[in-house]
From Swiss-Prot:
<keyword id="KW-0158">Chromosome</keyword>
<feature type="compositionally biased region" description="Basic and acidic residues">
    <location>
        <begin position="379"/>
        <end position="388"/>
    </location>
</feature>
<protein>
    <recommendedName>
        <fullName>Histone chaperone RTT106</fullName>
    </recommendedName>
</protein>
<comment type="subunit">
    <text>Interacts with histones H3 and H4.</text>
</comment>
<dbReference type="InterPro" id="IPR050454">
    <property type="entry name" value="RTT106/SSRP1_HistChap/FACT"/>
</dbReference>
<dbReference type="GO" id="GO:0031491">
    <property type="term" value="F:nucleosome binding"/>
</dbReference>
<feature type="compositionally biased region" description="Acidic residues">
    <location>
        <begin position="389"/>
        <end position="439"/>
    </location>
</feature>
<dbReference type="InterPro" id="IPR013719">
    <property type="entry name" value="RTT106/SPT16-like_middle_dom"/>
</dbReference>
<comment type="function">
    <text>Histones H3 and H4 chaperone involved in the nucleosome formation and heterochromatin silencing. Required for the deposition of H3K56ac-carrying H3-H4 complex onto newly-replicated DNA. Plays a role in the transcriptional regulation of the cell-cycle dependent histone genes by creating a repressive structure at the core histone gene promoter.</text>
</comment>
<keyword id="KW-0804">Transcription</keyword>
<feature type="region of interest" description="Disordered">
    <location>
        <begin position="352"/>
        <end position="439"/>
    </location>
</feature>
<dbReference type="GO" id="GO:0005634">
    <property type="term" value="C:nucleus"/>
</dbReference>
<comment type="similarity">
    <text>Belongs to the RTT106 family.</text>
</comment>
<keyword id="KW-0143">Chaperone</keyword>
<keyword id="KW-0238">DNA-binding</keyword>
<dbReference type="GO" id="GO:0005694">
    <property type="term" value="C:chromosome"/>
</dbReference>
<dbReference type="GO" id="GO:0003677">
    <property type="term" value="F:DNA binding"/>
</dbReference>
Length: 439
């Protein structure tokens, strides 16, 4: 038999202990309504002592908010918010160049840009009339763009001193040549050029049947320019315009189309093209179309180098340390386009009508048709007439009484205009009249 002690107490099972609420160590639990320290601090002002509980509640709330960890990093959260905002924004009617929702006609991923940002982007071409060029970042947003209607010129020029063949596409915007004064509506903020690099495929990267050079990309841009109705095309270097006397330093078999020059302390390259002179590729770029050039002169001509001075309507820009070997080629280019004569500047500005129209030749140097020649001739005649009117006004202001006071005053202009002294025929007639008088 089993005996149970009378003094043994039967243990009743206890429920599991309830865990105590976790108290945030950073949150200070407020004490009584008026601790002794507060009573002593506000002994002279009972109204302020009554408001201390409100300030304790506010501080407790702020400490509680600060102690809660963020669900994700701030940078990641910001990117997601930006992406959501851009995707939720409705697209403009008919599509928009700056809207990533607008589909591109051509896409080129991983393109290296140097201006306005030195970074790789996806290059996109939109071939509609309201299309243009845009760069897409890694997040899918449009980083920068330019409409076709705002494009002044597009160049495809070789990058000098490279072992592999590389080319820079240079887009000059309207009012972004870095030379001419800006119109008032731009408020001093000139549009920036766009430059990206194209590297020719070599070796295993060459695709059979495809042009490894920049030709296909240039043709795509040309197509878009035609669709937009700009009448422009991509300008390539042309040996008929200018080619350096020194071949490429890293590729002896290739012609060089540049001349190394300094603008101040910065070194760059001058390109003499069929539409003007471009200086690049570092900021600030400068593009001199023929209409903006008043005259071109030479300075500091030494045995090995010389300086080129380009005068515009508003300023004079000097490029230094040009190789003397390229002097003859540059001078031929200047003479060919009449850039050495400031008196022809008005005629050059008059020629700036339908400039850089699509030509039969790829380099854009083919002669215009008969209708364009007649229109251009009319503008030239107008410019000549304005110059003649100006000369006539100067002759009207001339004082004949001062002719004998200065030696040779006005003799050159009189000989050129044929309005001064007698020619040989007139002299013979005068002598004949004198003989008749004597008889």
């Amino acid at each position: 038999m089993v005996f149970t002690s009378m003094n043994t107490q039967v243990r009743v099972p206890q429920p599991p202990p309830v865990p105590a609420a976790v108290v945030n160590p950073t949150v200070v639990t407020p004490a009584g309504p008026h601790p002794e320290e507060i009573d002593e601090a506000f002994a002279s002002s009972h109204e302020l002592r009554k408001r201390t509980s409100l300030f304790r509640d506010i501080s407790t709330f702020i400490l509680g908010q600060a102690s809660q960890p963020s669900a994700e990093p701030a940078a990641k959260k910001r990117k997601l918010e930006e992406k959501t905002t851009s995707q939720s924004a409705p697209a403009a009617p008919g599509g928009s160049l700056v809207s990533s929702a607008t589909k591109a006609w051509r896409t080129y991923p991983g393109v290296s840009f140097s201006i306005p940002q030195r970074k790789k982007f996806t290059l996109e071409l939109l071939d509609k009339k309201d299309g243009g060029i845009r760069a897409i970042g890694a997040s899918g947003n449009v980083e920068f763009s330019i409409a076709w209607k705002d494009v002044d010129q597009v160049f495809c020029l070789p990058i000098p001193e490279k072992a592999k063949k590389q080319h820079n596409f240079v887009v000059i915007p309207v009012h972004g040549d870095g030379i001419n004064p800006l119109p008032e509506h731009l408020q001093g903020a000139a549009p920036e050029p766009i430059i990206w690099t194209f590297e020719e495929a070599t070796g295993k990267n060459i695709v059979e049947g495809e042009d490894p050079g920049p030709g296909p990309m240039a043709e795509a841009i040309h197509h878009c320019l035609i669709q937009a109705g700009t009448g422009k095309q991509v300008i390539f270097p042309d040996a008929e315009e200018f080619a350096s006397a020194t071949p490429e330093s890293h590729r002896k078999g290739d012609k060089a189309y540049h001349v190394k020059a300094h603008r101040g302390s910065k070194e760059g390259y001058l390109f003499f093209t069929s539409v003007g002179i471009l200086y690049g590729y570092k900021k600030p770029l400068a593009y001199f179309d023929f209409a903006s050039v008043n005259s071109i002169a030479y300075a500091a001509v030494l045995r090995n180098t010389f300086n080129l001075v380009i005068t515009t309507q508003t300023q004079e820009i000097e490029f230094g340390m040009l190789d003397q070997a390229d002097y003859a080629g540059i001078n031929d280019y200047v003479q060919k386009h009449g850039l050495q004569d400031a008196s022809l500047a008005a005629a050059r500005r008059a020629k700036k009508l339908n400039v850089n129209k699509p030509k039969d030749k790829s380099n854009g140097t083919a002669p215009p048709d008969a209708d364009d020649a007649e229109e251009e001739e009319g503008e030239l005649q107008k410019a000549e007439r304005e110059l003649q009117d100006q000369e006539d006004e100067e002759e009207e202001d001339y004082d004949p009484g001062s002719e004998g006071e200065s030696e040779g005053s006005g003799s050159d202009s009189e000989d050129e205009d044929g309005g001064g002294g007698y020619d040989e025929g007139d002299g013979d007639e005068v002598e004949a009249d004198d003989d008749e008088m004597e008889e």
